[in-house]
Structures are given as C-alpha cells and as structure tokens.
Amino acid sequence: MLRLEECRNYESHDFRVLPVIGSGEFASVHAAYWKNTQSKFAIKKFDKISTEKEIINEINLMKMVDFHPNIIKFCGIIKDETNYSLVLEYADSGTLGKYLMENATTIKWESQLKFAKEIASGVLCLHDNEIIHRDLHPNNILVHQHTIKITDFGRSSILNGVREKPIPNTNVKFIELYQKCWRNKPDERPEINQVISELNNVNPEINFNFQVNELTEELKNEDGFSDCDLSNY
C-alpha cells in the first residue's frame, strides 16, 4: 500500500491556481499553471471530511492504471494546512458531457466511435487490474487532445437509472450494443471484451450511407431535385 510521503510532493506556491473547473460532493477541481510556465495541470482539492485513507486509496487505484493512454495521469500531491490535493494531468477539452454538448452539430460518427472504443479500452484496463469504477458517466470522462481520459477513482455513488433515448441517425449496431449494456440483470450484460469486439465490428460507413440515402429521399421530394443522387458523390 502506497504511503503519501512516497508520492511526489509539491508546494501550493508552485502553482498559479485558476478558478474551479469542476466540483463534486467531496472535492473540487481547479486548473493551474506550474510556476511561471504555460504547463497546465488539474488540482483536485478534497474537502475537510475526506480521510487520508480515502485519498491514499484513490491514489493507489490511479497509479495502478495511469500508464494507459485513456486514463488520467497522477502527477503528485499538495499538502496544505487543512487537507491534501491531487496534482493530475489536465484535459484541455473538459468533460465528455461538455464536449458533446458543444460539438453536438459537428462531431462526426467516426469520432463518436473512436471515443466509445477508447472508453471501452480504459474500462478493460481497470477490469484487468480488478478495479471497478462504480461511477462512470460523461462528467467523469474527460477529453484531452481528442482522446478520452477516464478519471475520478474516488467514492462510488448510485445513479438514478435514467437511460437516454437513441439519437436520430445513430448507427443501429451501436444502439443495440449500448442497450445490451443497460440490461437490468448483470449476467445478461456483455463482458467488456465482447463490447470491444462488437465496437470493432461497427462500420461507420453504414451510418454515413444511411444519412446520405435519407437526405437523397428528402431532396427527391423537393422541386428540381428529382434526379439528384448524392450517393454518387
């Protein structure tokens, strides 16, 4: 078991801390610059009720898996008068939820499929190391340079069970896969290896062709476009 004194220790004055970029029930996250440089980090500040044991547990879990490209990297700790803070890799595009909202009309299907594969790859790494995240949702998944980063290995919580409705024009195979992952009985849900296998078999061209054909049909109903066939372009 790791001890806090074995981690790289930073002083609070080593960073120029910026306003809060995210917060939860037990901690807040700030962006921060290292000294007088443009090197940016994320500082996770725990509240006063977080115990040293809980903090050590979160650090241990991160250090077991942060070699993976889709898991946020742990850089060190800061100890001040009241509590500890974690120094973490900074994700320049924020949470996946925020990223999808800001790019809802422009994000391509290929990017969506890439993100899904990266999330599955990160989860597989956790499971290979016998770690269950327990609180994986779009606000605990970050995007850095168009790459997924899973974060927040703190306390577990129970979500409200609300499931999103399929977004129009989403690839049918993709919808079928994530609906299987939502099944109420755990033994009816696919294993993570099966999820990755099925994601690798999803053909983004099918979704693209569907959208082109749908648009072609719409244009055929418009005056002057009866002979239009976008599938040739």
What are these language model-derived features?
Residues 102-114:
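Activation segment of protein kinase catalytic domains, centered on the conserved DFG
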